[in-house]
Amino acid sequence: MPKYALVINEDKPMAVTTGEEILQRLEASGAAVLLHPAAAGRLGRPDLAAPEGPAWGEVDMLIVLGGDGTLIRAVQRVAPYGVPVLGINTGHLGFLTAMESGDALAELDRVLAGSYLLEERMMLEATVVRDGLALATMPALNDAVISKGPRARMVHLEVSVGETVVARYRADGVIVATPTGSTAYSLSAGGPVVEPTVDCLLVTPICPHTMSARSIVVGADVALAIRVAASPGEVGLSADGSDPFPLLPGDVVRVGRAPYTARLVRLPGYRFYDVLRQKLSGT
């Protein structure tokens, strides 16, 4: 018996309505369904509630209704287990989702029949090291961001690849993005768009103090480290928009490829550059 997990953005009425329809369709097909506890409450099905944990790693597919933010958070839960994720857009941009909510039921039937592709997307991990000790490791699909607090002035950051210092930034912060994240915050900060199949990481300063500061593209498997050289105030590390982990002067953030990937469900005919044109230019 196939088993699916369903996550919805409960704040979006369209996600709730479409979620109810998809749940009915899945159960009618004979599949077992797990619901995130919040979704179970919103859909009135507490009998299907399953807290995040090992059970989520045993499903055949995770179906997500919401925008890119909802999908990214869901990916973080199941990527270590290799679970495919199907995103259905009920938000605004929906750059990472596979289909729009209005097409969901018809397209879902194709997916349930096995007519889909799996796209592997690189993820990264950022580890905070203080006095030689690893304090925290944060996974991300889009990016890891070191940034100053709301009342702090510029932070001084030193970027190294291996034993070589490649950049020193006086800026509001720095973004380390995957190719997937190249169309997110990094793009807004002036970074390039990178095709998802390229094996690399992008280092982009945020509002640097000098015009000569530019993005750097490095290999995905290099030893990339960012040291907080000095900070006159608060500075923190966030991953995919998470709450920041506080950093101190002298802390080092080591960023590299995660030992797992995000597995995104795609419909036949998916092309990255078609999506890029449609989502970013509206044509």
From Swiss-Prot:
Cofactor(s) needed for function: a divalent metal cation
InterPro entries linked: ATP-NAD_kinase_N, ATP-NAD_kinase_PpnK-typ_C, NAD/diacylglycerol_kinase_sf, NADK
MF-aspect GO terms: ATP binding; metal ion binding; NAD binding; NAD+ kinase activity
Localization per Swiss-Prot or TrEMBL: Cytoplasm
Active site feature: D68 (proton acceptor)
Enzyme class name: transferase
EC number(s) reported in the record: 2.7.1.23
Record key words, sorted: ATP-binding, Cytoplasm, Kinase, NAD, NADP, Nucleotide-binding, Transferase
Gene3D superfamilies cross-referenced by the UniProt entry: Probable inorganic polyphosphate/atp-NAD kinase, domain 1, Probable inorganic polyphosphate/atp-NAD kinase, domain 2
Domain of life from the UniProt record: Bacteria
Biological processes annotated in GO: NAD metabolic process; NADP biosynthetic process
UniProt: NAD(+) binding residues: D68, G69, R73, N142, D143, R153, R170, D172, T183, A184, Y185, S186, L187, S188
GO cellular component: cytoplasm
Pfam families xref list: NAD_kinase, NAD_kinase_C
Major location category of this protein: cytoplasm
Function: Involved in the regulation of the intracellular balance of NAD and NADP, and is a key enzyme in the biosynthesis of NADP. Catalyzes specifically the phosphorylation on 2'-hydroxyl of the adenosine moiety of NAD to yield NADP.
Alphabetized PANTHER family for the sequence: NAD KINASE
Protein name: NAD kinase
Protein's organism: Symbiobacterium thermophilum (strain DSM 24528 / JCM 14929 / IAM 14863 / T)
